Design a protein with these regions (language model features):
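Ubiquitin-like/PB1-type beta-grasp interaction modules and other compact soluble beta-rich domains
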Residues: 1-90
Length: 91
């Protein structure tokens, strides 16, 4: 399943500056694994040491927040859009 992944500015160093990349995978976990295969180092910025989504990174498949779906097992149908959005904090 080919999906379009929108890459935030802070992670574009891993994608050669590309704002969008294509990835394969039937689930979000598969998409992240494919991203890592083609853009080494990006998975460590999205996943923690236990392989779970980092607390301050929001991921959407189409318009659905995966935290309220099936997490890393959320289906990524062909043609879906995946958005990686790091939380912004300030004080």
């Amino acid at each position: 399943m080919s999906v379009t992944v929108r890459i935030p500015t802070i992670l574009r160093t891993y994608t050669g500056g590309q704002a969008e990349v294509q990835a394969e995978g039937a689930t979000l976990a598969g998409v992240i694994a494919d991203l890592e295969k083609n853009h080494t180092g990006i998975a460590a910025r999205v996943l923690d040491d236990q392989g779970k989504l980092r607390r301050f990174v929001n991921v959407y498949v189409n318009d659905d927040d995966v935290r309220f779906e099936q997490g890393l097992e959320t289906a990524t149908p062909d043609g879906a859009g995946v958005s990686i959005i790091p939380a912004v904090a300030g004080g």
